[in-house]
Amino acid sequence: MTKDLYDKLMVFGNDREPFLTHNFMRTTDLDDGTATVTLPMHTESLNRWGGAHGGILFSLCDVAMGMAIMTLRQEMVVTVN
């Protein structure tokens, strides 16, 4: 991955995507084919039993997968079902 793409993805993953910032997700590391995205748990992210809500966990997986794919494709992509 180029330095330029790395920088763009880090800005996108940490500052530019409203859904990610709203849900406190942070991209902490990127490499070719991999992405580390962290998700601190907040009360808004929990289900009624106090565990992580399944929707937020799937969102985390979707974000990490999309970021990892972008490192290989060398371009911005959108994930779809």
Where in this protein do the model-derived segments appear?
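Terminal targeting signals and extreme-terminal segments of soluble enzymes
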Residues: 1-81
